Amino acid sequence: MEGLTFANGASWNLHMIYSDQIATDHCTIRSDGVWNGDGWDPDSATNCTLFACEFFTGDDAVAIKSGKNPEGNLINRPTKHIRVFDCHSGFGHGICIGSEMSGGVEDVKIWDCDMAMSTSGLEVKATKKRGGYVRNVEVRDCTLSHVMVHAVGYNDDGIGAPVPPVLEDFRYERVTLLGRYIDHDHVWHTCPAIELKGFDLPSHEVRNIHFKDVVLEDNRGPEQNILMQDCLNVSFENVTVRPGVQPG
């Protein structure tokens, strides 16, 4: 899919399920005002590449998925080998992995993206019932409103998996995190630049996360720029904190 404009689908605009070798480039996706209006959603799909695209979405610009419990656990078809680069959010929720990730997600690489104008920046989210895993995610050379890797309590319906999800092995390098986000009414708010929150069970912490050459904008004070709970093996290397810009 090249050079196309997709607009105002009833829900997700591009949904690639059980697919392989899908490339999308130089497209514009618009769904501002559409509830659950995701842009580009690989779902139990492999070897999908997205680049040089512009997003104005009512929900996630990109949502990487692999099925929802219990069907996703039973089918057990992971999403892997996803590449996203040179993409820009004009409005929307940014890039997300989950929360429908019951079949597992692995080997995701994201670079040269601008998700400053977004609600969630770059978010990895899972509920306790989902099961599955997200692992081996690399992000570099991006500007993001903020970063979240966290357990969430909403959309926690359906028969639960035997064990909670595993969230592990993330690397963020040369990223700028603004510590502020824009909501659905186009109003800016401050927020932690980094939020890491695992599940409160042994072996289900968020683990093995490395930040290197990161710039944080200080909008909330030093004790609120980074929030961590139920985490294991988190490291920071060469982090620069600069004065933030208060939302107007």
Predicted regions located by residue number:
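Extracellular/periplasmic carbohydrate-active domains that bind, remodel
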Residues: 1-248
